[in-house]
């Protein structure tokens, strides 16, 4: 976390992946996440992966449209007060 980004992965001083975490998959949360990911990626000169972290699965047509903008979903659930992420290793 750098004050703006929820979470990011860097290598040799360059941000490689940006994660935007949401506690809901509501329309408002999606608007917010898309805007944040796109705006935060603007000053990054290298290719950066954009990951939207959500608790509920999106409809496939929404996933497809997000992919057109380079945004990939990552889903999670809570088990015994711990987050469990589905497919995280495929995104790293």
Report the location of each language-model feature.
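Residue-level detector of flexible, active-site-proximal loop/helix-junction positions
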Residues: 25, 57, 80
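Conserved catalytic cores of phosphodiester-cleaving nucleases, focusing on short active-site segments
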Residues: 7-9, 13-26
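Nucleic-acid nuclease catalytic cores
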Residues: 43-71
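A glycine-rich helix N-cap at a beta->alpha junction
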Residues: 70-89
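A short acidic/basic microdomain associated with nuclease active sites
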Residues: 1-2
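Active-site-adjacent loop/helix micro-motif of nuclease/hydrolase catalytic cores
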Residues: 25-36
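Conserved beta-strand segments of the P-loop GTPase G domain that flank and frequently precede/overlap
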Residues: 20-22, 52-54, 76
């Amino acid at each position: 976390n750098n004050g703006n980004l929820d979470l990011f992965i860097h290598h040799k001083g360059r941000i490689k992946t940006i994660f935007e975490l949401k506690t809901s998959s509501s329309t408002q949360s999606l608007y917010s996440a898309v805007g944040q990911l796109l705006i935060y990626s603007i000053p990054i000169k290298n290719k950066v992966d954009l990951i939207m972290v959500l608790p509920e699965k999106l409809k496939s047509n929404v996933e497809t449209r997000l992919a057109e903008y380079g945004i990939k979903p990552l889903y999670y659930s809570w088990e015994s007060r711990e987050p469990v992420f589905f497919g995280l290793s495929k995104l790293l």
